[in-house]
Amino acid sequence: MLHLSEFSGPDALLVKSTEGCCSEPSTDLTRLPARDPPAATGYPAGDFLSWALSSCGAGEYLTDSCLLEGPAPTPPPGLGYSGSFFIQAVPEHPHDPEALFNLMSGILGLTPFPGAEAAASRSPLDASFPAGSDALLPGPPDLFSPDPGAAAFPEAFWEASPSAGAPSQCLYEPHLSAPDVKPGLRAPPASPALDTASAFKGPYSPWELLSAGAPGSCGSQGGYQAAPEARFPTTGAKIEDLLSISCPAELPGGPASRLYTMGTYDAFPLAPGDLGEGAESLPGLLTPPSGEGGSSGEGGEFLDGTQPELSPLGLRSATADLPKPLVADIPGSSAVPEPPVPPPAPFPPAKARRKGRRGGKCSARCFCPRPHAKAFACPVESCVRSFARSDELNRHLRIHTGHKPFQCRICLRNFSRSDHLTTHVRTHTGEKPFACDVCGRRFARSDEKKRHSKVHLKQKARAEERLKGLGFYSLGLSFAAL
């Protein structure tokens, strides 16, 4: 049983006038002042329609909803209704809000509730926004809400709600699939009349979802400000979450906190010095867990007592922990144990660069010729000669090419070498600068002097042999005295 007196509240019911309204509705409607209207004096408790019509004619509070042209019409005579009616609920659909609203619309002459087809055609994303040009008008409060302040529409939501036919200005709208839509989650009706969804509340009510001061609604500037739990996490928060998962701050040495089972990676332990500078921040890796052998004291003491010989790379060989079988245990082998395998020799130190005797200024990569090193080879395939200096190689190449750049001015003879031209000119001038030390004979070329000196050496050798035969050699007589 439902009485009309139950619909009385702090806000008056708004009636949508269909006659005399402006032909071009304004899309930028100003919200009504959020203050309580004066008490309707002289009307019964349930006669809200008469009070609304009289207020519209007086132009006191409902001027935006009426928008009448010309003088205000005479208020009709008061309409009162008192009584009660019963609604027989169908077992499948108990307390159907649409049926009740259609009945109330027929009695009060209000706009009927939109049908199921129109409600189904709306997207679930539009469930948070009312449809129609009068969406900016405040709706009735939740009659059965324990907190009347939480049941009212928030001011910031209706101030920034999009008008009819305009797309949503929110930057982010949550996508709700069909199973996620709650049965009691409905859009506010197109008519500003009674919303029966608030009278028969479901598991969730739109007034509860749009509570006052909700940060998830559109602000007055038109930008969306998501709730703290609905916002995307910042990049810093994501990095901190990843670091907290992959790099825990502390790694205690207990058995329950080990990342792997015992014996999985124990074949390659590291010495404290091999871990570098970060070994101080890893106490759990160097300290043996309690109850696993050894004392649970400092990790350095434990490793100093149990760590075997390390290779140059700082890793222990995989066979160090495995027990080596004795030779006597192997069938068919002698009882003589094998000699111990010597540890691997460390890497030899790099040899320092050998410096020259005088500490020459040339480095090891210098291309200067070394003594007795012939770095310049003849490029001719049939010639195998090589030279220590580049000018000698150039002089040698003139033999293969036949080039003779030096010419005698007297006889116009050409020579491939300058020293040959010099000795040739001495033949014309008669100059003999080289003299023999024994006989004093003079020569124009140095090689001729050397050849002549060999003659004197042979003569000396023959004279000594002759003296030996005569016996004068022992007396000390010289060859010149004979």
Curated annotation (Swiss-Prot):
Ranges of Gly residues composition bias in the record: 291-302
Protein location: Nucleus
SUPFAM superfamilies, per the entry: beta-beta-alpha zinc fingers (SSF57667)
Biased composition (Pro residues): 337-349
Alphabetic keyword roster: DNA-binding, Metal-binding, Nucleus, Repeat, Transcription, Transcription regulation, Zinc, Zinc-finger
Gene3D superfamilies, alphabetized: Classic Zinc Finger
One of the record's GO molecular function terms: RNA polymerase II cis-regulatory region sequence-specific DNA binding
Cysteines joined through disulfide linkages: none
Entry comment describing in which tissues the protein is expressed: Expressed in brain. In the cerebellum and frontal cortex.
Gene Ontology biological-process entries: regulation of transcription by RNA polymerase II
Protein name per UniProt: Early growth response protein 4
Organism of this sequence: Bos taurus (Bovine)
Gene name of this polypeptide: EGR4
